[in-house]
Amino acid sequence: TVSVTLGPSRLGGSSSGVVVPDMDLLELPRPPSTSPWAYVKIAEGCDRACGFCAIPSFRGPQRSRTIESILAEVDVLARSNRSSGREGGGEDATLRAREIVLVAQDLAAYGRDQGIGQRDIIPLLTAVSQRVDWVRLLYLYPSDLTEALIDAILSTGVPYFDLSLQHTSRPVLRRMKRWGDGEQFLERIARIRELEPDAVFRSNFLIGYPGETEEDHDDLLAFMEAAQVDWCGLFTFSRESGTYAASLPDQVAPELMAERHAEASELAETITAERRLDRVGRTIEVLVDAPGVARSTGEAPEIDGIIAVPEDLTVGSLLEVLVVDAEGPDLEAVPVSDHTGG
């Protein structure tokens, strides 16, 4: 294992204030996948100016990879064969990727910096979906969730929507320099569920942004109840040096932030548990990630719950299972053939 430390440097040692990365993260070599899924980064940096975020200051503006380079990487991952080391218990076996997870700071903005159109994520998504069984998008801005993109995601057979909402109160979102409000977000979610009732949603919310009132917090809780987001990440605000939010007035006291975070977390955990319980008794397709561990299209790797399955199922296989139990964010399932005696 090689540790790589990336930090900002100034071009030519000048004091112009232009900060660039020491190494373009897009040029880092990708290690082979030891799981039947893999992340593929399609762009680095971000052109947005969210009030709480320092990413543009140290990763720079968005730089998209070419479609050709992305597809070449996907092809390599999709062709890799399971090595004999896996059968013998080796930990460095390389698996063929059955799922590709596309990631970027601003995924739907892919290609705009190259001047090749406003919706290049759609043809890229389509091309990747033709190479692997599942393709998943992580981190979509709600303002970019067009009907065309919704249709493209649903057509892949992975109805999973990771939406970067951050809050639902219009005043808070405007102080964050972000688009939308809870009502607009609910309309998008309802539209997707109208098209695909089994669609799964993930989002992150920032608690205690400067100026957040009790009314704002209640607005967020009401949205969570109404939206029934399956997977919810909750974070408390912390000042990032150099960001717009760092110098805003009306900073929320840490004790109050912690109280609001606990309240929202309890609600989020309850919603997740209830939505998982609704899956008991259903037959779903899963990908076996590791001995005894699987996921369906409704769980992103590493960040969502898992599905416990018999340990003798082949890692990297896709199969139908019957969900027999739920505990919090996790499910338990058995192969359909076992349950039917076939």
Question: Where do the model's predicted regions map?
Answer:
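Contiguous mid-protein beta-loop-alpha structural module that forms a pocket-lining wall or clamp
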Residues: 212, 228-229
